[in-house]
């Protein structure tokens, strides 16, 4: 089982050339990012080819959700992504509207021929373990991008009481967002800090189970994106009064990448 590490552009600074060059020099398989602005599409494509980076496209739905999903996914195909990660629908939608959305989403996925992992994200349809399980059982072909940090935050637990839901999610994950959360938030200040060793161990256990299951199913690789976020997003902890981030964003994601490379091979 090969682990493919992707660099999230979230929080990076500089031009696309600056960002993608840094990712390539750091040894990442590819990048994960939203679709580029239309006036930068050619530059973005050329840089991916020049630097030999794969691309995971991110799409974010808004009202009307079916239409915005379809438009973004079809546009994403122009960039030959290895995978599409979607922030899909909303948590407050009626269940019948969510079912209608995901039925349509599966048809679009089949049309474009690219795997789509619907992210387990706060404010979205898959914002809890139990709502996600319900959708996955309703649609056997539906896949997720596993970002369990959001579920820890929503449930205010380390998911001890949701073993059956977690088992379903683990078996349906096609991509991992490797960020460590805790019971009161989606991102610990630093995953290497000893005071968060319990949280790190829990997340590594979940990730290993995903990787092991994919290996048993005959997949040759699992893709993972270390995705600790910046201070201006509300994810990175900051010092009071100054607003200074408590750690360096590049360093914390590099720490996670190195840890994955050393520990995640089954």
Residues of each region from the PLM?
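Glycine-enriched alpha-helix->loop->beta-strand junction motifs that scaffold or abut catalytic
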Residues: 27-29, 50-53, 80-82, 138-144, ...
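Short, hinge-like loop/turn segments at secondary-structure boundaries
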Residues: 48-52, 73-76, 102-103, 134-136, ...
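Histidine-acidic metal/acid-base catalytic patches
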Residues: 2, 13-22, 138-143, 152-266
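Hydrophobic faces of well-ordered beta-strands that scaffold small-molecule active sites
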Residues: 1-8, 31-33, 53-60, 84-86, ...
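Alpha-helix-loop-beta-strand connector modules within alpha/beta enzyme cores
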Residues: 42-63, 104-112, 138-139, 204-209
């Amino acid at each position: 089982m090969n682990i493919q590490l992707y660099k999230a552009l979230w929080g990076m600074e500089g031009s696309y050339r600056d960002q993608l060059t840094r990712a390539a020099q750091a040894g990442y398989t590819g990048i994960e990012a939203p679709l580029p602005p239309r006036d930068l599409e050619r530059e973005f494509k050329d840089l991916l080819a020049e630097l030999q980076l794969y691309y995971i496209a991110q799409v974010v739905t808004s009202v009307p959700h079916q239409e915005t999903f379809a438009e973004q996914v079809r546009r994403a195909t122009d960039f030959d992504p290895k995978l599409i990660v979607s922030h899909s629908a909303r948590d407050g939608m009626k269940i019948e509207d969510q079912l209608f959305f995901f039925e349509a989403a599966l048809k679009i996925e089949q049309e474009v021929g690219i795997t789509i992992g619907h992210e387990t994200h706060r404010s979205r349809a898959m914002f809890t373990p139990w709502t996600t399980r319900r959708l996955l059982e309703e649609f056997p072909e539906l896949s997720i991008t596993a970002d369990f940090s959001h579920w820890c935050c929503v449930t205010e637990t380390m998911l001890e009481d949701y073993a059956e839901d977690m088992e379903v999610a683990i078996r349906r994950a096609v991509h991992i967002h490797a960020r460590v959360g805790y019971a009161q938030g989606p991102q610990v200040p630093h995953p290497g800090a000893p005071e968060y060793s319990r949280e790190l161990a829990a997340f590594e256990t979940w990730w290993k189970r995903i990787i092991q299951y994919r290996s048993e199913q005959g997949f040759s690789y699992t893709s993972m994106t270390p995705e600790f976020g910046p201070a201006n997003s509300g994810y990175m902890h900051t010092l009071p009064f100054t607003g200074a981030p408590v750690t360096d964003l590049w360093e914390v994601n590099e720490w996670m990448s190195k840890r994955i490379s050393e520990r995640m091979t089954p």
